[in-house]
Amino acid sequence: MDSKNKYRLATDENGSPFVLNSKGSIDFGYITEEMNLPPAPIRIAEGDERYGLMHIEQRHGNQIRDNGFDTTVEFVEYVSRNFDRIMQGNRDSCLLEVTDGKHNDTLFVRLFKHQGYWKVISGGVFNIRYSKKKKEIYSGSDNRPPQPASDGEDLAPQ
């Protein structure tokens, strides 16, 4: 499948097309009010070397595949739907993390309030010490609210 078929005509503030998830939507997951942040969908644009899918693929693609994911898009969808912790990042970013005690599958997101979404800037598989000293915004390992538009499929890597 040509990669252009994985994008919608909707674009980010830089004109970069949003990537579609496995259900054909530009919304990969959601941050809800219960998470102590402004509620909005999580989206990722094709981007370039500074942000988005292209940035993650160039910097962390091999590492992501080495950790059981077939594609970077699969990794982004998995973390967006399954994060169990949110940490304060640098400046105005947040880290969405799926923790397992060995490493954290992490997405760096930033709120674009006027456009109404959380934008994936970067991501990768990091040592658990990476975010240890960052401020925790949300922990939902036992009380995660249901994710809108989820069909209950487990997107864990095989």
Predicted feature residues:
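Ribonuclease/tRNase effector modules and their secretory precursors
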Residues: 1-158
